[in-house]
């Protein structure tokens, strides 16, 4: 792992990393997030009785859309031609929470970690948005990179 911030130049200014000379390689990243809620809120989601519709389907689509828009949200991210985005949601009633996982892939010159993290985060935010009328004290937590493959820095897995 590097001990240098690649997005800070010699003058200490933020800049977009030049990836022109980097090789095109297959890259993928997996991320997760959790949203904790009351058991009654989770049951409403699981039973499909939420008045706004299918919470998981909406959150999944939001996560996919967010991955595609990451460079619009995070200033120094490169716009990427993603070849796969997957968002999965798993109700965990024993913990009164939903686990969101995301997978992003491409063949390119830069990694997809931020896209995977953005997908998981926005899916969690979408669940919050859809359920806030029922419960306002839900907690989004543990947003993290689970794994990344490809590129110069190699393989990382928690």
Curated annotation (Swiss-Prot):
UniProt-listed SUPFAM superfamilies: Molybdenum cofactor biosynthesis protein C, MoaC
Binding-site positions, substrate: 76-78, 114-115
Assigned keywords, A-Z: Lyase, Molybdenum cofactor biosynthesis
Enzyme class: lyase
InterPro entries found in the cross-reference section: MoaC, MoaC_bact/euk, MoaC_sf, MoCo_biosynth_MoaA/MoaC, Mopterin_CF_biosynth-C_dom
Any Pfam family hit: MoaC
Keyword Protease: no
Active site: 129
Catalytic activity reported: (8S)-3',8-cyclo-7,8-dihydroguanosine 5'-triphosphate = cyclic pyranopterin phosphate + diphosphate
GO molecular function terms noted in the UniProt entry: cyclic pyranopterin monophosphate synthase activity
Physiological role: Catalyzes the conversion of (8S)-3',8-cyclo-7,8-dihydroguanosine 5'-triphosphate to cyclic pyranopterin monophosphate (cPMP).
Database matches in HAMAP family: MoaC_B (MF_01224_B)
Assembly and oligomerization: Homohexamer; trimer of dimers.
Record-given protein name: Cyclic pyranopterin monophosphate synthase
Organism this protein belongs to: Shewanella baltica (strain OS195)
Name of the encoding gene: moaC
